[in-house]
């Protein structure tokens, strides 16, 4: 996480910077963000992991390092959200869990788009045009 902090602050700390993170990469970015002032570039988080998850349907669970840290910081108002950030998560995503992502977004002021009929892989048909629009702004 410290390497991400160092890279962002050394090479990408400007308003024209674009950072795109997917899944666990979003988790790493958010933990790096927790150690910095609000990132001033643009950030797009796709299917972000925001804590631990369990799926009884697939009999799978995952608990990343420090699984409650982001929630704790957000609930206490101590999470410095990026200045310009958007989150997209599939409504059927059992790894990112849309309700958890939406709760995190509400606590941090980060807008969350829930993609209908999509899982953890949002798919090229959705992400391609999203990136085209996002990069054009």
PLM region spans:
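Catalytic histidine-centered segment of alpha/beta-hydrolase-like enzymes
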Residues: 118-129
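Short beta-strand/loop motif that positions the catalytic acidic residue
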Residues: 81-82, 86-89
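Conserved alpha/beta-hydrolase "acid-adjacent" motif
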Residues: 94-100, 123
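Gly/Ala-rich beta-loop-alpha elbow adjacent to hydrolase catalytic centers
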Residues: 20-29
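Hydrolases whose catalytic domains are alpha/beta-hydrolase-1, hotdog thioesterase
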Residues: 28-32, 54
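Alpha/beta-hydrolase active-site loop
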Residues: 1-11
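Active-site nucleophile loop of the alpha/beta-hydrolase fold
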Residues: 44-53
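Residue in the alpha/beta-hydrolase core beta-strand immediately N-terminal to the catalytic nucleophile
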Residues: 17-18, 42-44
């Amino acid at each position: 996480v410290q390497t991400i902090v160092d890279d962002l602050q050394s090479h990408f700390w400007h308003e024209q910077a674009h950072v795109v993170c997917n899944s666990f990469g979003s988790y790493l970015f958010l933990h790096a963000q927790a150690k910095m002032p609000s990132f001033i570039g643009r950030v797009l988080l796709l299917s972000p992991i925001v804590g631990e998850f369990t799926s009884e349907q697939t009999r799978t669970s995952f608990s990343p390092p420090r699984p409650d840290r982001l929630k704790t910081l957000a609930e206490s108002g101590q999470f410095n959200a990026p200045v310009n950030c958007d989150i997209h998560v599939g409504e059927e995503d059992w790894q990112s869990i849309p309700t958890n992502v939406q709760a995190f977004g509400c606590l941090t002021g980060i807008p969350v788009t829930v993609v209908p009929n999509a899982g953890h892989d949002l798919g090229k048909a959705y992400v391609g045009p999203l990136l085209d629009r996002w990069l054009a702004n």
